[in-house]
Amino acid sequence: MGKVIGIDLGTTNSCVAVMEGGEPVVIPNSEGSRTTPSVVAFTKNNERLVGQVAKRQAITNPERTIISIKRDMGTDKRVKIDDKSYTPQEISAMILQKIKADAEAYLGEKVTQAVITVPAYFSDSQRQATKDAGRIAGLEVLRIINEPTAAALAYGLDKESDQKILVFDLGGGTFDVSILEIGDGVFEVLATSGNNRLGGDDFDQRIIDYLIDLFKKEHGIDLSTDKMAMQRLKEAAEKAKIELSGVTTTNINLPFITADANGPKHLDVTLTRAKFEELTADLVEKTMEPTRRALEDSGLTPDKIDKILLVGGSTRIPAVQEAVRKFFGKEPFKGINPDECVAIGAAIQAGVLTGEVKDLLLLDVTPLSLGIETLGGVFTKLIERNTTIPTKKSQIFSTAADGQTAVTVRVFQGERAMAADNKLLGEFTLDGIPPAPKGVPQIEVTFDIDANGIVHVSAKDLGTGKEQHITITASTNLSEAEIEKAINEAKKYEEEDRKRKESAETRNNADSMVFQAEKTLKDLGDKLSSEDKAKIEAEIEKVREALKGTDTQAIKKATEDLQQAFYSVSAKIYQQGQAAGANPGAQTTGGEQGNVYDAEYKVVDDDK
């Protein structure tokens, strides 16, 4: 079995780790960074960029740059670029392809399997979408695990004593809180809660809205209609937020942000930490409600929590740390890297699956209740939230009308009393039920949640033994045909990326060869015959001409021809030098040492 990597597929940044020698190691990307921006872009000539290079060009190419795609996972949203539309799964797969390629370069071997993390509060459709993204990227996703649980694995791998820990995970786009009991290699999740629409992006947006408002009041211009200005504001807001974690005042200076009839306009604003905290106070408070709910579900009080782990870049915000400190009456633990611990935990889980990590048992839970719609639109729960997974539960239902021969099973996920207020995961029909008075037929509905948190449902007529099975595939998930098409598209992009890389390397080699040849011509000077010099210069010119085009093979051929000509001349000079050194006539001519060398050079010239 090859290496199985652990991936934290984040809203803002992603990270990958692997087990090496029994220890989890973060894999740096091709740019040398330990995290990769979760950004995808398409240039005007449709070249695909992923990661740091995509983020760098976002200001000049905002309409073709895709950020925070994780927030759209499990939805039917599409990203339209020119005449092609991409699903969130396909965009996520592009990020995963980059991560996969970087891991392969680091490990020196093909990588085909991974453990990928998701927010604990992700629904079934969001989890399935993540699995599909992995498949499109050429990865078999062995396990989907919850981000807070992964962070707990990273923290507790070497801990001996029993502890109750709370993981407070505030990332770029999502918020989770999980409470676990750990000890003797067992990691048991007691409760989890969260908010899939709360994260660092929302804190950035408050600064952006504030700057737009100030600028409008001062200049009467609405920057929100200018996409390039908005991208500059987004980057400046993120930078200001990060800076305010370390200082109490920062300056946001964006010259030439826009222009009107009177000329260019500049934005120059001083933002204090106090003002930032005022703008985002309600966002910080929003993290407290899921925290209270998780504590309530676990049956614990704040004083019973031994450690609070801060996970996700947004937990560096001082107001967030202060809110946690105030709520629990103790300092949160800061001994783990909030950007890397989730990927490290995923790598540990990968190690468990491959047998590299022994004596570790992970017991996770389902974040939301699961059930079906029953008479009157009521949501009847079969599996309560925070039930340990994998799990299986059955319940007997019956028909609602006399002579009813079919029942439609509509599967929902959520906590509301009425089915319509929860998320519909999918539906299927069990037909062929023998006609009978209402309430007589016995229909057994079984819910089965696997270790990935993905739901399988079956309905069985106990009278006839007829059964229907489905793995939930909501309308937002991709069909098998769509996945296959996306896999082929991804392979095509991979091939294009390979060709682009080959082209760049070929051009670099050609440039390098031309430089080397020209330098050697200059260094050799008169030692080179005019015939050989002309030959090399002609080959250099052929390479230059080839470089003007885009034919990689032509550039390769011209470079190889120059290389051969260069080697041929070099060998000739070397042989002539040896022959001249061995000529005894040079020793018996007499005269001074200088004359001997003159004679040698003349001999070389004569031979040519």
Curated annotation (Swiss-Prot):
Domain of life: Bacteria
Sites bearing Phosphothreonine, chain numbering: 174
MF-aspect GO terms: ATP binding; ATP-dependent protein folding chaperone; unfolded protein binding
UniProt feature, compositional bias: Low complexity: 577-590
Cystine crosslinks: none
Region annotation Disordered: where it falls in the sequence: 493-514, 577-608
UniProt xrefs under InterPro entries: ATPase_NBD, Chaperone_DnaK, Heat_shock_70_CS, HSP70_C_sf, HSP70_peptide-bd_sf, Hsp_70_fam
Expression induction or repression: By stress conditions e.g. heat shock.
Alphabetical keyword list: ATP-binding, Chaperone, Nucleotide-binding, Phosphoprotein, Stress response
Gene3D superfamilies from the UniProt entry: 1.20.1270.10, 3.30.30.30, 3.30.420.40, Actin, Chain A, domain 4, Substrate Binding Domain Of DNAk, Chain A, domain 1
Function: Acts as a chaperone.
Family, similarity comment: Belongs to the heat shock protein 70 family.
HAMAP family in UniProt: DnaK
UniProt-recorded name of the protein: Chaperone protein DnaK
